[in-house]
């Protein structure tokens, strides 16, 4: 669905050749949100993710898809695995002749930020403990 604002801005979500194209930015204004709460245990979630190398299966995907993407070795996550850990970042859509799952890496960024913050807190606590033990 596409929307045009009074100022002429175009926004929405589009599918093109099976790709889910989003905006270059995402609206994140607090005034647009409700029920705001922190993501629980983001570090635990991130540690369960398994980054992988892979190649697109040309026997399943149309050649147009493969040609429109980088060929050869890719890097990413497996949507089914991510869905078990962080289901909010996985979406299933009809692309070409099938229903396929995809990972919204933009949404995953919020979980990664939470994990870094949680890990940094642990580091600071350990540094404090080391300082106390050394004195």
Which residue ranges define each predicted feature?
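C-terminal intramolecular chaperone/auto-processing assembly modules
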Residues: 28, 33-35, 65, 87-135
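Short, surface-exposed loop/helix-turn segments at secondary-structure junctions
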Residues: 63-71
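Periplasmic N-terminal gating module of Gram-negative TonB-dependent outer-membrane receptors
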Residues: 34-48
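Stable alpha-helical elements in mature extracytoplasmic
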Residues: 42-45, 78, 112
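Trimeric beta-solenoid/beta-helix "fiber body" segments of extracellular/virion adhesins
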Residues: 1-30, 41
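Acidic glycine-/aspartate-rich tracts in secreted/extracellular proteins
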Residues: 51-52, 89
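Short aromatic/basic micro-patch
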Residues: 76-77, 102
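Active-site-adjacent helical/loop segments in soluble small-molecule enzymes
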Residues: 54, 82
């Amino acid at each position: 669905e596409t929307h045009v604002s009074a100022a002429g801005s175009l926004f929405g979500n589009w599918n093109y050749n099976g790709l889910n194209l989003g905006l270059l930015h995402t609206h994140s204004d607090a005034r647009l949100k409700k029920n705001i709460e922190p993501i629980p245990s983001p570090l635990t979630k991130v540690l369960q993710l398994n980054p992988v190398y892979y190649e697109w299966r040309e026997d399943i995907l149309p050649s147009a898809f493969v040609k429109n993407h980088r060929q050869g070795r890719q890097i990413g996550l497996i949507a089914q695995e991510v869905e078990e850990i962080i289901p909010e970042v996985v979406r299933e859509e009809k692309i070409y002749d099938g229903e396929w799952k995809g990972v919204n890496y933009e949404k995953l960024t919020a979980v990664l930020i939470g994990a870094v913050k949680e890990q940094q807190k642990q580091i600071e606590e350990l540094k404090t403990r080391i300082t106390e033990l050394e004195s």
